[in-house]
């Protein structure tokens, strides 16, 4: 009897998930611009600031940066001077999505 109730409950909970979000695992969810902005807040703003001008611990002022997209990607990936590498903590796709966020901080 308990097994029947469990089975019915399991089937009903599976059927109630009709959207793709219920089926698709979170790691397969596309990385969005909003996610990139949040990633900047979490990984970058503590040194660069929300406006790119903080300069904590020698962080460069991103509002005056002239780096190309490739240079920004390389800096995020490998780090530079006191900035650590993020190669092990975020994906290349996420790094590429950070480029427009970083460039949006320019004057």
Where is each model-derived feature located?
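The canonical Cys-X-X-Cys-His
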Residues: 36, 40-50, 98, 102
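N-terminal export/targeting leaders of redox proteins
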Residues: 1-30, 107
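Conserved beta-strand positions that form and line the central face of beta-propeller blades
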Residues: 61-62, 82-85
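Gly/Gly-Pro-rich "capping" loops immediately C-terminal to redox-active cysteine motifs
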Residues: 27, 31-37, 49-77
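C-terminal capping alpha-helices of c-type cytochrome domains
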Residues: 76, 88-107
């Amino acid at each position: 009897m308990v097994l029947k109730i469990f089975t019915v409950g399991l089937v009903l909970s599976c059927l109630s998930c009709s959207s793709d979000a219920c089926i698709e695992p979170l790691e397969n969810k596309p990385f969005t611009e909003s996610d990139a902005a949040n990633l900047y807040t979490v990984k970058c703003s503590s040194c660069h600031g929300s406006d790119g001008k903080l300069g904590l611990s020698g962080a460069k002022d991103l509002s005056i940066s002239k780096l190309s997209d490739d240079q920004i990607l390389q800096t995020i990936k490998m780090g530079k001077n006191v900035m650590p590498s993020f190669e092990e903590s975020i994906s290349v796709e996420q790094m590429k999505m950070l480029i427009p966020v970083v460039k949006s901080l320019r004057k």
